[in-house]
Amino acid sequence: MNGTIYQRIEDNAHFRELVEKRQRFATILSIIMLAVYIGFILLIAFAPGWLGTPLNPNTSVTRGIPIGVGVIVISFVLTGIYIWRANGEFDRLNNEVLHEVQAS
């Protein structure tokens, strides 16, 4: 019984669409985050003096601090974007798959 349900889910066009869209979207977001993180690490490795330069002569806050915070903020934003799309389009496709499989 369960084997046939799993097979019907795998054969469902909406399920294949869901898997493809979710994988593509997650890959794009992962590549963006990886590029941001590697860029930050490369700055640390090859331009530590530039990162260590104060933003203002009257402060001890360096360029590296807001850039590091920016990396963290970007990760939160990308996570929020994924959640927003997952709760909308991906959940809709998931529900379509469930209704079609249960109806057949």
UniProtKB/Swiss-Prot annotation:
Q: What is this protein called?
A: Inner membrane protein YjcH
Keyword Ligase in record: no
| Membrane topology annotation | Multi-pass membrane protein
Instruction: Kindly list the residue ranges recorded as spanning the membrane.
Output: 25-47, 62-84
Cellular component, GO annotation? plasma membrane
Chain ranges sitting on the Periplasmic side read 48-61
Q: InterPro entries under this entry? A: DUF485, Inner_membrane_assoc
Q: Which residues lie on this side of the membrane: Cytoplasmic?
A: 1-24, 85-104
Tell me which UniProt keywords the record has, alphabetically.
Cell inner membrane, Cell membrane, Membrane, Transmembrane, Transmembrane helix
Cellular compartments annotated: Cell inner membrane
Query: Keyword DNA repair, does the record have it?
Result: no
Q: What is its main location?
A: membrane
